[in-house]
């Protein structure tokens, strides 16, 4: 009987556990597909909503900094609480999206790529090459601020420079209640996103396309 030596790891894997069924599935994956073949070295972080609440979300930041250190991580799906979840889990506050927190720290790019292997047929049978979707992972809606507008009034966008320069634009004149959302991004992160996309396209030999709504959003997009 031949017993295969387990694959040795030199760099620890940052292991981010999640919520609900993902906890069960991740444990099953480790038991059935990883432990028998790999001498797993990992740094474990419990990103389940209960533990995030117990640590005042510090565990999310710790897991992101560990990922910065080691350069590799696996994250399970997590709950981003809404008002109903705050009540259900008796949370201290409505904690922010763990994905948003981690992406902001890593200044990363999200690449969503299909699994292309024999035995898994695509819906379009003659579709042989993958399509990968890249998304800028910093800022935008994940770092947005929101206001419930109570009644009539004027909403303004104001930038005050460190040199005292003030730039002001009127967003909307409300004649009744409404909502406001402010988003931002920074050139450094935008340039990093572009470099990541070009590098990924070159590494995987895929054609790179860029989509934007600059006909409407002439400065932001």
PLM feature spans:
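N-terminal alpha-helical transmembrane segments of multi-pass membrane transport
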Residues: 5-11, 21-26, 30-57, 64-67
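N-terminal glycine-rich phosphate/adenylate-binding segment common to multiple enzyme folds
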Residues: 50-162, 166, 179
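Short, Lys/Arg-enriched N-terminal segments with co-localized hydrophobic residues
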Residues: 1-3
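Glycine-rich phosphate/diphosphate-binding loop of Rossmann-like nucleotide-binding domains
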Residues: 9-28, 157-163, 169-221
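An acidic- and aromatic-residue-enriched active-site/binding cleft used to recognize and process polar
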Residues: 47, 79, 213
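Solvent-exposed alpha-helices and their adjacent loops that cap or buttress functional pockets
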Residues: 5-7, 14, 65-68, 122-127, ...
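Generic secondary-structure signature for well-ordered alpha-helical cores
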Residues: 31-35, 39, 69-72, 104-107, ...
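General structural feature for long, well-ordered alpha-helical segments within catalytic domains
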Residues: 21, 25, 29, 33, ...
């Amino acid at each position: 009987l031949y017993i295969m030596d387990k694959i040795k790891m030199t760099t620890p894997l940052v292991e981010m556990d999640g919520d609900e069924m993902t906890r069960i599935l991740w444990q099953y994956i480790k038991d059935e597909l990883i432990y028998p073949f790999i001498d797993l070295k990992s740094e474990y972080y419990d990103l389940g909503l209960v533990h995030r609440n117990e640590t005042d979300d510090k565990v999310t930041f710790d897991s992101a900094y560990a990922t910065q250190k080691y350069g590799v991580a696996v994250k399970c799906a997590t709950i981003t609480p809404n008002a109903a979840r705050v009540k259900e889990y008796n949370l201290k506050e409505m904690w922010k999206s763990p994905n948003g927190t981690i992406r902001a720290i890593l200044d990363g790019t999200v690449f969503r790529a299909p699994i292309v292997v024999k035995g898994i047929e695509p819906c379009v049978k003659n579709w042989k090459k993958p399509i990968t979707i890249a998304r800028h992972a910093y800022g935008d809606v994940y770092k947005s601020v929101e206001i419930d507008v109570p009644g009539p009034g004027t909403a303004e966008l104001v930038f005050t420079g460190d040199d005292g320069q003030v730039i002001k634009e009127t967003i909307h004149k409300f004649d009744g209640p409404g909502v406001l959302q402010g988003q931002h991004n920074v050139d450094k992160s935008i340039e990093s996103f572009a470099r990541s996309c070009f590098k990924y396209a070159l590494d995987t030999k895929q054609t790179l396309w860029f989509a934007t709504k600059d006909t409407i959003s002439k400065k932001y997009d």
